[in-house]
Each structure stands twice: as C-alpha cells, then as structure tokens.
Swiss-Prot record:
Transmembrane segments: none annotated. InterPro entries: FeS_biogenesis, FeS_cluster_insertion, FeS_cluster_insertion_CS, FeS_cluster_insertion_RrpA, HesB-like_dom_sf. The lineage of its organism: Bacteria, Pseudomonadati, Pseudomonadota, Gammaproteobacteria, Enterobacterales. Keywords: Iron, Iron-sulfur, Metal-binding. Iron-sulfur cluster binds at C42, C106, C108. Its cofactor is iron-sulfur cluster. GO terms for biological process: iron-sulfur cluster assembly. The keyword Iron-sulfur applies. GO terms for cellular component: cytosol. PROSITE patterns: HESB. Binds 1 iron-sulfur cluster per subunit. This is Iron-sulfur cluster insertion protein ErpA. Belongs to the HesB/IscA family. Required for insertion of 4Fe-4S clusters for at least IspG.
Amino acid sequence: MENAFKSHLQFTEKAIKKIKNLIEIEKNHDLKLRIYINGGGCSGFQYQFIFDTSINEDDIIITQSEVSLIIDPISLQYLYGGQIDYLENLEGSKFIVSNPNAKNTCGCGSSFSI
C-alpha cells in the first residue's frame, strides 16, 4: 500500500536531504528508510531506523519528495501524525521523531511511552 498514509507521517526537508545523501553514498536507489517500533529503552518503546530493500506484504510505503519510508501497520499506529527529522549537533547526528502520541520520552529522545 503506497501513499494512502502520507499525511499521517511526514519527513522534514532536512530528513529528506539526509536520506537522499545516504542513498547516493550507498549507490543503491532501491533503498528505502524503514522505521519500526521495538520494546525497550528507558520509556518502554524505541524507534528503530534501517535502510532496507525488502518490502513485506503488509508494509506501508510512504513517499515524499522522492524519498520512501517503509513502515509496518502496528508501528504506524504508534507514530500516527508524527514527523521524522534529522538532527546534527555537537553530540552527533541522528534521525528523530516528533511523536504526538508519546506521553513521555527519555532524555535522549530515542524511547517513549504511550
């Protein structure tokens, strides 16, 4: 299923630029960013990001500005209405999620609770 959920999870321009840059470095234009939720972290759930070429039967593909995100339906429920950004500062660089469904987040921003 592609783009039916586009308005439910968005990329910022910085995230789009970084994803395109990483795909260029890998020289594999079939790569898509997969985001999924795992149990763990100090708040109960963790965001996980990987580049992937495999698409499972129930995966949802969201494309924005020629960048595709793969997400499973269960993870999308936790991220509904969210935004993926990319942050670079003195502490390092990472993809971050602005999640309106999270009741609490940890200090590092990589885990949350609902």
